[in-house]
């Protein structure tokens, strides 16, 4: 799975891309038209493949000796480049100083977030939102039942966002994936060294307790997921199989789920598991969605979903009936699992507005809202009650096909810095200020329990973790320490902790630390230490809120 094909450009023996039937949907013609316009079609095919990064022209020993090098995918290529993910350090993503919030003002998500963070009905003054004022109200017995509501607890926690590096684990190769389990007790990390590492996160710890060698890995593990019961995890790679492995027990029990693809070079870029653990959803480089039934132990669906790589899949909520997919055609599609058929692959709707391929999708978990990260250097917030028109879909497709740069090894063109809204863009909000280069960088909603999902956070090609306020669109926090792009980020479901996974070969845990002391809060030994060595950050006293069982 790790090879690339090369052929002489002058020999006329160029092999067509094996995924071209799906990638070049706009180039399909009848056999009669192909015979009449063969030369034109070949030129269009070559231009398309060069533009999308599927092939590259490489000069050999002489000026006339040109070779076509076939790359595996526009999204995750199966070899390491010289820049090693550090090109993005030279790119300073433009920050949107005045985000357009007009669509959000009249959408229900604004009310939902304000309710979840205890801000509904409050004014806009800083005093009304201040932490001291909330404590004063509680002391006076003005809070509901004498204590903070769940929304007020989330508002309190918003004052203690992670800001300090508390733990680092270093690997010999790039870290690709890193996620917390649903209960926050385990963190799973996947690295290019084909090793999956599991960390015990109970009782405030972050201790590695198991390392598992992944099987049938081409280039790297590309995505991971936990099963709902928390006893197994799944991973995908450049392989025909999605693997499932046990977490507990002495041995490692691996089971291969055969997707039986039509492509010879095949990769699953994104995976998701249904809430009952029965079905596994995958998005692949052949433009298809795959559904594998674990009870029947077979692939049950192969849906032609996108015109290019499917980079992202997600279930909309716990029912697992509605699902989302996003691809390099810049379109996010919404599917109903109950009506999905191979002979009639029609989504229930589409969301258009991105100008380049989608790298990741995260659902808010309410079967209505989702966010998508894109190579156009933006995150967009969507409401599935606002599907895009045909005009919007055509505008996004056209913008994506007109991109003439490759995000894997080229700098972002200046035209992509412009704040431009495509005709028919149905998104509620656009977030700018992070970089999406080199790889499929992830973005996610912050947890509901501790933050009321009032934030969106993303990895960044400049080695940062960027946290946005969902309603204002402004950046509220940047975590900076990595030396290469941050591909994955994961926020603990109940605690103010964020873990970043980077191509610099490190995993980093971020927590809140108080930067200033108040004399009344310090012991005599603390005062002596500060006077002798200067101020140093100390752990913030934990704000103890109960978590659901």
Swiss-Prot record:
<feature type="repeat" description="WD 6">
    <location>
        <begin position="435"/>
        <end position="480"/>
    </location>
</feature>
<feature type="compositionally biased region" description="Basic and acidic residues">
    <location>
        <begin position="80"/>
        <end position="89"/>
    </location>
</feature>
<dbReference type="InterPro" id="IPR017399">
    <property type="entry name" value="DCAF11/LEC14B"/>
</dbReference>
<keyword id="KW-0833">Ubl conjugation pathway</keyword>
<feature type="repeat" description="WD 4">
    <location>
        <begin position="305"/>
        <end position="345"/>
    </location>
</feature>
<dbReference type="GO" id="GO:0050890">
    <property type="term" value="P:cognition"/>
</dbReference>
<feature type="compositionally biased region" description="Low complexity">
    <location>
        <begin position="1"/>
        <end position="24"/>
    </location>
</feature>
<dbReference type="GO" id="GO:0007613">
    <property type="term" value="P:memory"/>
</dbReference>
<feature type="repeat" description="WD 1">
    <location>
        <begin position="170"/>
        <end position="210"/>
    </location>
</feature>
<dbReference type="GO" id="GO:0035640">
    <property type="term" value="P:exploration behavior"/>
</dbReference>
<feature type="modified residue" description="Phosphoserine">
    <location>
        <position position="73"/>
    </location>
</feature>
<dbReference type="InterPro" id="IPR015943">
    <property type="entry name" value="WD40/YVTN_repeat-like_dom_sf"/>
</dbReference>
<dbReference type="InterPro" id="IPR036322">
    <property type="entry name" value="WD40_repeat_dom_sf"/>
</dbReference>
<feature type="modified residue" description="Phosphoserine">
    <location>
        <position position="75"/>
    </location>
</feature>
<dbReference type="InterPro" id="IPR001680">
    <property type="entry name" value="WD40_rpt"/>
</dbReference>
<feature type="region of interest" description="Disordered">
    <location>
        <begin position="80"/>
        <end position="100"/>
    </location>
</feature>
<dbReference type="InterPro" id="IPR020472">
    <property type="entry name" value="G-protein_beta_WD-40_rep"/>
</dbReference>
<dbReference type="GO" id="GO:0043161">
    <property type="term" value="P:proteasome-mediated ubiquitin-dependent protein catabolic process"/>
</dbReference>
<dbReference type="InterPro" id="IPR051859">
    <property type="entry name" value="DCAF"/>
</dbReference>
<dbReference type="GO" id="GO:0016567">
    <property type="term" value="P:protein ubiquitination"/>
</dbReference>
<dbReference type="Pfam" id="PF00400">
    <property type="entry name" value="WD40"/>
</dbReference>
<keyword id="KW-0853">WD repeat</keyword>
<keyword id="KW-0597">Phosphoprotein</keyword>
<comment type="function">
    <text>May function as a substrate receptor for CUL4-DDB1 E3 ubiquitin-protein ligase complex.</text>
</comment>
<feature type="region of interest" description="Disordered">
    <location>
        <begin position="1"/>
        <end position="40"/>
    </location>
</feature>
<feature type="repeat" description="WD 5">
    <location>
        <begin position="353"/>
        <end position="392"/>
    </location>
</feature>
<dbReference type="GO" id="GO:0080008">
    <property type="term" value="C:Cul4-RING E3 ubiquitin ligase complex"/>
</dbReference>
<comment type="pathway">
    <text>Protein modification; protein ubiquitination.</text>
</comment>
<comment type="subunit">
    <text>Interacts with DDB1 and CUL4A.</text>
</comment>
<feature type="repeat" description="WD 2">
    <location>
        <begin position="216"/>
        <end position="258"/>
    </location>
</feature>
<keyword id="KW-0677">Repeat</keyword>
<protein>
    <recommendedName>
        <fullName>DDB1- and CUL4-associated factor 11</fullName>
    </recommendedName>
</protein>
<feature type="repeat" description="WD 7">
    <location>
        <begin position="481"/>
        <end position="520"/>
    </location>
</feature>
<dbReference type="GO" id="GO:0005654">
    <property type="term" value="C:nucleoplasm"/>
</dbReference>
<dbReference type="GO" id="GO:0006979">
    <property type="term" value="P:response to oxidative stress"/>
</dbReference>
<dbReference type="GO" id="GO:0050821">
    <property type="term" value="P:protein stabilization"/>
</dbReference>
<dbReference type="GO" id="GO:0010467">
    <property type="term" value="P:gene expression"/>
</dbReference>
<dbReference type="GO" id="GO:0003016">
    <property type="term" value="P:respiratory system process"/>
</dbReference>
<feature type="repeat" description="WD 3">
    <location>
        <begin position="263"/>
        <end position="302"/>
    </location>
</feature>
């Amino acid at each position: 799975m790790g090879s690339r094909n090369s052929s002489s450009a002058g020999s006329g023996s160029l092999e067509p891309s094996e995924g071209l039937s799906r990638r070049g949907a706009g180039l399909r013609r009848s056999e009669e038209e192909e015979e009449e316009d063969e030369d034109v079609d070949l030129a269009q095919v070559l231009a398309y493949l060069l533009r999308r990064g599927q092939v590259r022209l490489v000069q050999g020993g002489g000026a006339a000796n040109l070779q076509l090098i076939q790359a595996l995918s526009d999204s995750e290529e199966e070899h390491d480049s010289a820049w090693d993910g550090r090109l993005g350090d030279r790119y300073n993503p433009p920050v949107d100083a005045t985000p357009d919030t007009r669509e959000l003002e009249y959408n229900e998500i604004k009310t939902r977030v304000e309710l979840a963070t205890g801000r509904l009905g409050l004014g806009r003054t800083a005093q009304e939102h201040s932490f001291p004022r909330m404590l004063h109200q509680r002391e006076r017995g003005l809070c509901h039942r004498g204590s903070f509501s769940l929304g007020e607890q989330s508002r309190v926690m918003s004052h203690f966002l992670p800001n300090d590096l508390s733990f680092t684990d270093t690997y010999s190769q790039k870290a690709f994936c890193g996620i917390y389990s649903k209960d926050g007790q385990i963190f799973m990390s996947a690295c290019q060294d084909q090793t999956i590492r599991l960390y015990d996160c109970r009782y405030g710890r972050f201790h590695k307790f198991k390392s598992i060698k992944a099987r049938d890995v081409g280039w790297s593990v590309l995505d991971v997921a936990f099963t709902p019961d928390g006893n197994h995890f799944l991973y995908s790679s450049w392989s025909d199989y999605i693997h499932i492995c046990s977490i507990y027990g002495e041995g490692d029990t691996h089971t291969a789920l055969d997707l039986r693809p039509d492509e010879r070079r095949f990769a699953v870029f994104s995976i998701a598991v249904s809430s009952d653990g029965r079905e596994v959803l995958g998005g692949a480089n052949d433009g298809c969605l795959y559904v594998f039934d674990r009870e029947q132990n077979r692939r049950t669906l192969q849906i032609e979903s996108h015109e290019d790589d499917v980079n992202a899949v997600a279930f909309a909520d716990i029912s697992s009936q509605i699902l989302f997919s996003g691809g390099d055609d810049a379109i996010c599609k919404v599917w109903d699992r109950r009506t999905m058929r191979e002979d009639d692959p029609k989504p229930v709707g589409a969301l258009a507005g991105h100008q380049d391929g989608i790298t990741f999708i995260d659902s808010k978990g309410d079967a209505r809202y989702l966010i998508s990260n894109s190579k156009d250097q933006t995150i967009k917030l969507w409401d599935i009650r606002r599907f895009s028109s045909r005009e919007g879909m055509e505008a996004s497709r056209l913008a994506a096909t007109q991109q003439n740069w490759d995000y894997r090894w080229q700098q972002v063109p200046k035209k992509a810095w412009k704040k431009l809204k495509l005709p028919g863009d149905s998104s509620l909000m656009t977030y700018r200020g992070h970089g999406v280069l080199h790889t499929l960088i992830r973005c996610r909603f912050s947890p509901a329990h501790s933050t009321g999902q009032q934030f969106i956070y993303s990895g960044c090609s400049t080695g940062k973790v960027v946290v946005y306020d969902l309603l204002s669109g402004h950046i509220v926090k940047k975590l900076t320490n990595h030396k290469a792009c941050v591909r994955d980020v994961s926020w603990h479901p109940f605690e103010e902790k964020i873990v970043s996974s980077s191509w610099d070969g490190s995993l980093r845990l971020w927590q809140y630390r108080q930067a200033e002391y108040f004399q009344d809060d310090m012991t005599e030994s603390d005062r002596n230490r500060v006077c002798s060595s200067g101020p140093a950050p100390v752990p913030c006293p934990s704000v103890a809120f109960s978590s659901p069982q």
